[in-house]
Structure formats: structure tokens, C-alpha cells
Amino acid sequence: MASSNRHWPSMFRSKHATQPWQTQPDMAGSPPSLLSGSSAGSAGGGGYSLKSSPFSSVGEERVPDPKPRWNPRPEQIRILEAIFNSGMVNPPRDEIPRIRMQLQEYGQVGDANVFYWFQNRKSRSKNKLRSGGTGRAGLGLGGNRASAPAAAHREAVAPSFTPPPPILPAPQPVQPQQQLVSPVAAPTSSSSSSSDRSSGSSKPARATSTQAMSVTTAMDLLSPLAAACHQQMLYQGQPLESPPAPAPKVHGIVPHDEPVFLQWPQSPCLSAVDLGAAILGGQYMHLPVPAPQPPSSPGAAGMFWGLCNDVQAPNNTGHKSCAWSAGLGQHWCGSADQLGLGKSSAASIATVSRPEEAHDVDATKHGLLQYGFGITTPQVHVDVTSSAAGVLPPVPSSPSPPNAAVTVASVAATASLTDFAASAISAGAVANNQFQGLADFGLVAGACSGAGAAAAAAAPEAGSSVAAVVCVSVAGAAPPLFYPAAHFNVRHYGDEAELLRYRGGSRTEPVPVDESGVTVEPLQQGAVYIVVM
């Protein structure tokens, strides 16, 4: 075959170099049928021969003469590349003559040449996709191995003279990458494979750089968020007895001496630290409790100590949970007023003075935020004998004194019901009362012994089997009620009311009720119950 002899194109160039150019217009002006017939006869050789003219004899055609390969001109390659890039990868038979007529304006070409050019171009595209990321050298080797005719025509050299191309409307605008000269061919020839290789090697590089920039940008954006979270959530999990950490700056989340993280961008939205500092002026939100160590300076960390722990309702046991014992800002919405949300400064002094008596109360109430229940506990006068036994008291409409704090300790000490059992109540005998310290500081009405005597005097009037019930709401505590040891209707005080049994100290337990709001078990004799509204 003609493709196996690689020296034939050079022979063809030296033989026809002295021929005048006037023979080609005659060939171009010949009928297309003769050209197509001659090119069809030379299809086996893979090209068109200039010797096959309508004036040549049959004997000359039968002589085995080497037929040179068709070397496309740059203008013809531009037209073919434009058609290939438009989507016509494998043109049909009726379209090949039309393409050939366009190419003949720049030089001789046959139908077979057009057909094989598209076949080779399609093979080069497939090989380029297979070896996409191997680099420019790998792509060039893959294209040469896949198409031997394409490698052969790169070595051919076009004639030295090139006619000026006429002005024709191109199918598509010519890209500058397609005009690059192949490194193997002569300066006048061009190839699309070189441009494809150069463009293919540059595009993955751009994609890699873009991807690297995107990852870097994402890390830069996430680092301030990590710094802010680290600064704001540092206080969680620290014990109360440990010395407080140095408070960070209020107006700068990231200190200037720690350039590890980027500065948080400025925005019109204030953070929680800035908002609290602007409203409260840098003060602590809860009252300072006296402690052996000197108090730390107010700052952003101490301001919001225990602000994030929010519980909807108290747990079933009512005491000794992990969050409860830690005391990090537990906040109940409406039914835990008896659990120490309004602990006053005087009560804090009492608990600190008697740690061996009120350890559980102090551990339960440390760190609870003040929500307007009062700062000091005034004298609340309670008349135990005013309520008749077995009659439900009305819901307290008028609140207690405006600065009265409502806690389990204050309710029990005020009502003198901590030792309400019949065996323990005696006139002027409250020696075992663990809340006697409150009376020593003058925080309850009179002495507890007088209230205990009133309770002892009221118990025989109500009968031997009675229980004490104290109604507690946000407004304050109502006078105690002596109720018979029978079933108790909690719904009388509202659908949200709860009944707790007082166990002493700050310990309470919920009393189970049925669907109608009546206690499952009757009230125990001598027990103390608290209705939370």
C-alpha cells in the first residue's frame, strides 16, 4: 500500500516542483464526476493523484504508480475543523460532496480524502479523551499510535507557493488555537492535534488552581467561626470551685496577641457578648456570692456564666441531677419558683455561714439567675389557724410583698411545716429544724417556735389525720391549709398546677395524679405538700 512507503511524498514533491501552477485551475474546473471517479479509483491508496486526468489513457492508469497522500492546506483544515466542532463528527454520504466543493477552492481534494479525514479526526479525539491527564507528551503519542495516516501527512511539506485565499463566509469563527503550527510539520502546514494537545494540557492546570483557591478560601472563612465558638463556649463544663478563667475582651472576640485565627468580619449584627455588655454595662447578671477567694473582675465570660442551659420543666426527682448540682444557670419557665430562682443575698449569707446544715440547698441554688423574684426576703406573717381543715383555699389573687423571694426553704420556714408530723410538733419545740438559721438572721416572721405552737394548736382542731398543704405561685405563697388525709383535687388550682411532697431541706417529690387531677393515693398523715401554680 502507498501508506507503507514513507519516501513517496518526498518523491512527489521533487517531481512536481517544476510544474507550473496553471495545471491546477484546469483540474479544479473539471466536472466533479470525473474528479470523484478518479478519487474513488485511488481510494485504496488513501489519496488523489494529479496524474489521473481526463486526458490520460487507460493504459497509463493501469500502470502501478505510487499515489502520494493528500496534504491538506491550512485553509482546508480550518473548514474541516469548523465542521467537526459543529457536531458533524461522521458526515453522511450526501454531505461529503458538499464539503469537498468547499475545500476545492483552496486545492485538489477528493471524497475519499474528506471521509478519511473525519475518521482520523474522530480517532484522535477518542485517544485524547482516554489519556486526558497524562500530559502533552502522552497525548501526542496516543494520537500518533491511533492514526498512522495522520502521522504520515504531518511529515509531508506543502508546495512553496500558496495562492491568496478568496473571501468566503466561514461556517464558524476560527479560533486562534487552531492556527498554531505543528512541531513536526513544515512552517506552512498546521494541525489541529497540536492545538488540541496544548489546550488540553492547559485546561486541567487551570482547574487545579481554581480548586486549590476554593479550598483555601473555604478554610479562611471557617477559621473565624471556630475561633468564636472556642471563645464563647469555653465556660461550659468548668466546676464552680475552680478559679474563673481570664475574661476576654468585650469588643474583640480574638485578642491581638493571638494571631492564630483571622479577625471576625465587621457587621451591623452584635454578638451575645457585645449585646450583654451594652445593656448591662459589663456587670454580672446574678448577684455575687461571698466566697473565700477574691471575686474576679467582671467581663464577658463571667457575665454570661450559665446563660445557655435552658430546661423547660424540673425533672421528676426534683433534685440531684447533674445540671442541677452544677448550678450553671438552670432556668425553668414557670413551675420551679420553689426551687430557688429567687435566692436572696441574705439567704446566701445564711447558707455560707452554716455549710454543714444547708449544703444541699447551697449546691442546688448556686449560679441560678435572678429573674425579678426579689433581692431581700421580708417578714411574711402567716396565720396558720385561719384556714379551716378540709376546705380548699382560693387561688391567691394578691401577690406577696413585691420583694419577697419564693423558695422551698422560705415556704417551709415561713409556714413552720418542716416538722409537721404529730410526733414532732410541740409547743415551742423546733430544735431539729434545719432552717433555724433563717430565723436567726430575721428572715422569717417572728421565731419558728411561735409558728410551731400555732401549728400544734391548729392540728387538734382539724382532727388527728390531717396533712398540711401550701399553695405557691409566682406572686408568692398563700397561708398553709390543713387538709384531711384523703384524696386531693389538684385541678382546683388550675390545669398546670402540680402537687409536690416536701421531704425536708430542699428535697421534694412529685405526687402522682390521675387524668381528672385527683391524687391516686390519699394524702399522708402529718406530711407537708406544696401546690405549685
UniProtKB/Swiss-Prot annotation:
Residues 59-68 have a biased composition (Basic and acidic residues). Residues 132-143 have a biased composition (Gly residues). GO terms for molecular function: DNA binding; DNA-binding transcription factor activity. It comes from the Eukaryota. Gene3D superfamilies: Homeodomain-like. The keyword Repeat does not apply. It is found in: Nucleus. The keyword Calcium does not apply. GO terms for cellular component: nucleus. Residues 1-74, 125-212 are annotated as: Disordered. One of its GO terms (biological process) is regulation of developmental process. Residues 161-174 have a biased composition (Pro residues). It holds the Pfam family Homeodomain. Its main location: nucleus. Keywords: Developmental protein, DNA-binding, Homeobox, Nucleus, Transcription, Transcription regulation. Residues 28-41, 175-202 have a biased composition (Low complexity). Residues 65-129 bind DNA. Belongs to the WUS homeobox family. Transcription factor which may be involved in developmental processes. This is WUSCHEL-related homeobox 7. It comes from Oryza sativa subsp. japonica (Rice).
